Swiss-Prot record:
A motif ('HIGH' region) lies at residues 58-68. Keywords: Aminoacyl-tRNA synthetase, ATP-binding, Cytoplasm, Ligase, Metal-binding, Nucleotide-binding, Protein biosynthesis, Zinc. Its cofactor is Zn(2+). This is Isoleucine--tRNA ligase. IleRS has two distinct active sites: one for aminoacylation and one for editing. The misactivated valine is translocated from the active site to the editing site, which sterically excludes the correctly activated isoleucine. The single editing site contains two valyl binding pockets, one specific for each substrate (Val-AMP or Val-tRNA(Ile)). Its EC number is 6.1.1.5. The gene is ileS. One of its GO terms (biological process) is isoleucyl-tRNA aminoacylation. It catalyses: tRNA(Ile) + L-isoleucine + ATP = L-isoleucyl-tRNA(Ile) + AMP + diphosphate.
Length: 937
């Protein structure tokens, strides 16, 4: 028997079936770099304008983790998709290089040597440390397949950048928004520095909780409570921070609450009326009784006695007093709480905070000198018990602020700090207005989150008592301690930062006479001796100034950005500081839209932690699966919530990837002999080919819309469904006969190849932002006869216009009906297959019994129904002539009869036909005979 395999047009491509991603990806990255593909992509785009995504700088410390990989890949998808849609979209990566984590690492490395080293040398070691990890992270990000200006990133420690930071501060000073005062702020006594709200995280903590008597000897007591005994009456407070009691200055009540005088045996106490029952139960006072009730405002100004010292504690009023816990009488230490501080300002109380930077009581503190606050609680409680001041004590577990870096509990401590006022120049009001009116928040709940944060936040403490950062450019009078920071002078200092090889190191290295203006006298005391301010700026001011240092300075960028894209924790971080600085200095927000993603958790939804042993690194995934699978994972999840990852999840994505890759390989294999001048005009293509182009073009359009709306998981599902359902399971399955057995130059085959060519281009453009390595690899294997010599990369392809592929609604509706008929035919065939009467649908003869309207539809579509249904023989008969064995269909006006095909099976196409019309080819059908004969010519 003759073998006709050589006469078939079988797929032919050298595109490898096995991806070999781990080995192949680095080769592609090297090729991208050698051929400047990122730059060429930018050159090829821009017809529709520009799109600006501004990179939030990761911290230059340690290796990247899955969270940073998720973030960078999301940004890369945005950048590539926008460029391929015709928008020039540059990606300038950045790094946050100053701050405590780096300084602490350097301190660990230096050990005791740090004490003997000059500040400039320590700063230089910090810079080297940041540079080291910047280089490490840069290579790790490039390994993710992320395009960008990797040779020209922005760094917050660049001299120009440090200069801009100082200029932004000068703008605030110019507007009168910067104040220096003694206020209680978050203080980490382990790190010995002030903290911003963004540097504080909450965790469960066990605290001592005590009810404390403050004796009242004020003679006014008898005027309000005639029954009270001045020798045994107290007002009772409840506190979970006993260590702050040495700093007590007052007791706060709510003016509108009722307060009761209670008698228990020979003792009298004052607490809020609504809390009497709860408190008595906690005190185990069964026989106590209410003597009299008055309002809080009636007690204002009365003097109590401090429970530890021979001093007074005034009764004051405050709206912050609630009835949620305690006694309704609030211990007030203005040096250790923002609400206490506000009350102190109204009543002219001393803002007393007798602690050093390490959280130890000063030598002037009686009983507790030298004790650290975390050691002080039991000692304070013991002393209170000695004085019989405690009614009841226990412990509670509650959410308590901790340092983001060292994880230690933090305290409020009043120190002299620099602040940006939230009220001056209406910074708070303008920011809240912009949040509501000028910015799109994705997802929408981000709006309420940042709005509430800014609505309730205190003034921004911008000073830090550390070394590694941008100095606060100000002079301090040696005589009176007042500061001088004229904005014009600050701007001149900033100019020196810009030209100094190590930027703001100029502040520390320059001679004092080169910094202090000649003849400068203190406006307050006329002193002429000055010293430099030693505090540095909050690193959130550094990164928050990036719009000024990057967007307003770099070519191809601009202000404001179209998009900021970071993790949801940045509502209190970079989004927050950037907004305040931009509103404060420009009057407008720095971004049009803010997109946030969640955290990466394990397959069970648990937070990843080393202690749980469930941490997965990007490097592990890349070395096992290749980064393409990691990128596919990013696109497959709804990243706006926390996203799960596990080996099982990744394995499923490997399978999905394989299907997409195999689809591309099949398309490549079947256009290997096609040339551009052989492309068939769409209107002249076979009906089925026109239909599939409509299907793919519609999906392609939806995918592009999903890229624009950042719905990348929709892109993944549409792309995967297109490859598996619309193409592999439907169109490509039908097409095999026409592609393999038709004449090599026949219209039918060229029509099919034309469709495959266009489909491949739509697939490539759909997948390239996500599956960048595979798309590039596929593009390289497209025959040169089908490519523009000047377009060397898939990322240089122009935007693909699909309008000519779209069918009108009537034809599309006809096809939808025809596919329903196809499904009915397949269902009717299945019983014969199960019985073993046939092995393949080609073994069947189908009779369609149709009503007139269906008959008209079938004729109008003018398609080969045998090919569409993958059967050998098909007849169309009037429904009225339906045989008794015809299966009734779910479609009105249709019945289907299935029989074995008549005749013999063609050796070449496997369809049942009358064979041997040409005696030279006794086993071929007439169609195959003609094709084989023509091959001789």
């Amino acid at each position: 028997m003759t073998d006709y395999k050589e006469t078939l047009n079988l797929p032919n491509t050298t595109f490898p079936m096995k991806a070999n991603l781990v080995q192949r990806e680095p080769e592609i990255i090297l090729w991208w770099e050698e051929n400047a593909v990122y730059e060429k992509m930018l050159e090829a785009s821009g017809a529709k304008g520009i799109f600006i995504l501004h990179d939030g700088p990761p911290y230059a410390n340690g290796h990247i983790h899955l969270g940073t990989a998720l973030n960078k890949i999301l940004k890369d998808i945005v950048i590539k998709s926008r460029n391929m849609q015709g928008y020039r979209s540059c990606y300038v990566p950045g790094w946050d290089c100053h701050g405590l984590p780096i300084e602490l690492k350097v301190e660990q490395e230096l050990g005791k040597k740090k004490q003997e080293m000059p500040l400039s040398l320590i700063r230089n070691r910090c810079r080297e440390y940041a540079e080291k990890f910047l280089d490490i992270q840069r290579e790790e990000f490039k390994r993710l397949g992320v395009f960008g200006s990797w040779d020209h990133p922005y760094q917050t420690m660049d001299p120009i950048y440090e200069s801009v930071i100082t200029l932004e501060l000068a703008r605030f000073v110019e507007k009168g928004s910067v104040i220096r005062s003694k206020k209680p702020i978050y203080w980490c006594y382990s790190c010995e520095t002030a903290l911003a709200e963004a540097e504080v995280e909450y965790a469960d903590h066990t605290s001592s909780a005590i009810f404390v008597r403050f004796p009242i000897h004020d003679k006014r007591l008898h005027t309000i409570f005639p029954q009270a005994d001045l020798t045994t009456t107290s007002i009772v407070i409840w506190t979970t921070t006993p260590w702050t009691l040495p700093s007590n200055m007052a007791i706060a009540l709510n003016a509108d609450f009722d307060y009761a005088l209670l008698q228990y045996k020979n003792e009298y106490i004052i607490i809020a009326s609504e809390l009497v029952d709860i408190c008595l139960k906690q005190f185990n006072w069964e026989d106590a009784k209410v003597i009299k009730v008055v309002q809080g405002k009636d007690l204002e100004g009365m003097k109590a006695r401090h429970p530890l010292y021979d001093q007074e504690s005034m009764i004051v009023l405050g709206d912050h007093v609630t009835l949620e816990a305690g006694t309704g009488c609030v211990h007030t230490a203005p040096g250790h709480g923002p609400e206490d501080y506000e009350v102190a300002l109204r009543y002219n109380l001393d803002v007393y905070s007798p602690l050093d930077d390490q959280g130890r009581y000063l030598d002037t503190v009686k009983f507790f000198a030298g004790l650290r606050v975390d050691q002080a609680n039991p000692v304070v409680i013991q002393k209170l018990e000695e004085f019989h001041r405690i009614i009841q004590k226990n412990t509670i577990q509650h959410s308590y602020p901790h340092c983001w870096r060292c994880k230690s509990p933090v305290i409020f401590r009043a120190t002299t700090q620099w602040f940006i006022s939230m009220e001056k120049n209406n910074l708070r009001e303008q920011s809240l207005k912009a949040i509501k009116k000028n910015i799109e928040w994705i997802p929408s709940w981000g709006e309420d989150r940042i709005y509430n944060m800014i609505a309730s936040r205190p003034d921004w403490c911008i000073s830090r008592q550390r070394i590694w950062g941008v100095p606060i450019v100000a002079l301090i009078c040696e005589s009176c301690g007042e500061v001088w920071n004229d904005p014009s002078w600050m701007k001149k200092i900033a100019e020196f930062f810009a030209i100094h090889p190590r930027g703001c190191d100029y502040w520390y290295e320059a001679k004092l006479e080169d910094i202090v203006p000649v003849g400068l006298k203190c406006p307050h005391c006329e002193g002429e001796q000055w010293k430099r301010e030693s505090d540095i700026l909050d690193v959130w001011f550094d990164s928050g100034s990036s719009f000024a240092a990057v967007l307003e300075e770099r070519p191809n960028l601009g202000f404001p950005a179209d998009l900021y894209l970071e993790g949801s924790d940045q509502h209190r971080g970079w989004f927050h500081s950037s907004l305040l600085i931009s509103i404060g200095t420009r009057g407008v927000p720095p971004y049009h839209a803010v997109l946030t993603h969640g955290y990466v958790v394990d397959g069970d939804g648990r937070k990843m932690s080393k202690s749980m042993g469930n941490v997965t690194s990007p490097q592990e995934i890349i070395s096992k699966f290749g980064v393409e699978i990691l990128r596919l994972w990013v696109s497959s999840v709804d990243y706006r919530e926390d996203v799960r990852i596990s080996n099982e999840i990744l394995q499923r994505l490997v399978d999905a990837y394989r299907r997409i890759r195999n689809t591309c390989r099949y398309l490549l294999g079947n256009i290997n002999d096609l040339t551009l001048d052989e492309l068939v005009p769409v209107k002249e293509m076979e009906s089925l080919d026109q239909y599939i182009l409509d299907v793919v073009a519609t999906a392609y359009t939806e995918i592009q819309k999903s890229y624009i709306s950042y719905d990348f998981h929709t892109v993944f599902h549409k792309l995967h469904n297109l490859c598996t359902t619309d193409l592999s399971a439907f169109y490509l399955d039908i097409l095999k006969d026409r592609l393999y057995t038709s004449g090599v130059r026949s219209h039918k085959r060229k029509s099919a190849q034309t469709a495959l060519f266009y489909i491949l281009h739509m697939l490539l453009r759909s997948m390239a932002p996500i599956l960048s390595f595979t798309a590039e690899e596929v593009y390289k294997y497209i025959p040169d006869t089908l490519k523009d010599d000047n377009v060397i990369s898939v990322f240089m392809l122009p935007f693909f216009e699909t309008s000519s592929f779209l069918l009108d609604d009537r034809v599309r509706s006809y096809w939808e009906t025809l596919l329903l008929i196809r499904a009915e035919v397949n269902q009717a065939i299945e019983p014969m297959r199960k019985k073993g009467e046939i092995g393949h649908s080609l073994d069947t003869h189908i009779t369609l019994y149709v009503a007139p309207e269906l008959h008209t539809l079938l004729l109008e579509l003018n398609t080969d129904l045998c090919s569409l249904f993958i059967v050998s023989q098909l007849d169309i008969m009037p429904l009225s002539e339906a045989s008794v064995d015809a299966a009734v269909s779910k479609i009105d006006g249709l019945a289907v009869a299935v029989n074995r095909a008549q005749g013999n099976k063609c050796q070449r196409c496997w369809m049942y036909k009358e064979l041997g019309s040409n005696h030279q080819y006794p086993t071929l059908c007439p169609r195959c005979t003609e094709v084989v004969e023509n091959m001789k010519i």
